[in-house]
C-alpha cells in the first residue's frame, strides 16, 4: 500500500530531522559558549572542537554570524586535521579572505558568502589571527576610502 509506505517514510524523515535539530541545538550551545569566552571584538570569529558533527557546522556558523555580526568559521578537529565551515556577513567576501591566507590551509572552496576549509590543526590559532588581521585591514581600507557598504560591522 503506497499510503502506508508514504506515512512510514514521512515518519522516518521526521525522526531524522528531529535528531538533526537536537544535534544542531547542542553544537550551537557549545559553540556559543566557546565564542563568548574567546570573542573580544575580533573582526572574524573562529571556534573549534573535537567530534563536532559535520552536517550542522554551516548552520551553527550562521548563528554565530547573527550573534556577533562578523564572519564566523566553525571547525571540527579530527586529530591533526580541522575541517571548517564558514559564513560571512554583509558584503564581506569570505572566500577572498581565506584565499589571502591559503598558505595555512590544506584546501578550501566556496564563494563570497560561505566557505569550506581544511587546515592542519596546528594552524588553527594562526588562521584565526590572520583572518582577523585581514578583516581589520579590509575595514580600515573601506574607512580610508569612505566606502560604507563594505565595512565589517
Residue ranges of each PLM-predicted region?
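Hydrophobic helix-and-loop "lid/oligomerization" segment in the mid-to-C-terminal part
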Residues: 1-132, 137, 142, 146-147
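Short, conserved secondary-structure transition motifs
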Residues: 149-153
Amino acid at each position: 500500500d503506497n499510503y502506508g509506505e508514504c506515512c512510514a517514510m514521512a515518519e522516518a524523515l521526521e525522526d531524522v530531522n528531529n535528531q538533526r535539530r537536537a544535534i544542531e541545538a547542542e553544537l550551537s550551545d557549545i559553540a556559543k559558549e566557546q565564542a563568548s569566552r574567546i570573542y573580544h571584538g575580533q573582526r572574524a570569529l573562529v571556534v573549534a572542537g573535537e567530534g563536532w558533527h559535520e552536517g550542522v557546522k554551516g548552520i551553527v556558523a550562521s548563528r554565530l554570524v547573527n550573534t556577533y555580526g562578523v564572519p564566523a568559521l566553525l571547525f571540527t578537529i579530527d586529530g591533526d586535521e580541522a575541517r571548517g565551515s564558514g559564513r560571512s556577513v554583509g558584503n564581506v567576501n569570505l572566500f577572498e579572505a581565506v584565499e589571502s591566507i591559503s598558505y595555512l590551509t590544506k584546501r578550501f572552496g566556496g564563494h563570497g558568502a560561505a566557505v569550506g576549509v581544511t587546515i592542519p590543526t596546528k594552524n588553527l590559532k594562526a588562521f584565526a589571527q590572520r583572518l582577523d588581521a585581514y578583516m581589520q585591514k579590509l575595514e580600515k581600507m573601506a574607512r580610508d576610502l569612505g566606502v560604507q557598504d563594505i565595512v565589517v560591522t
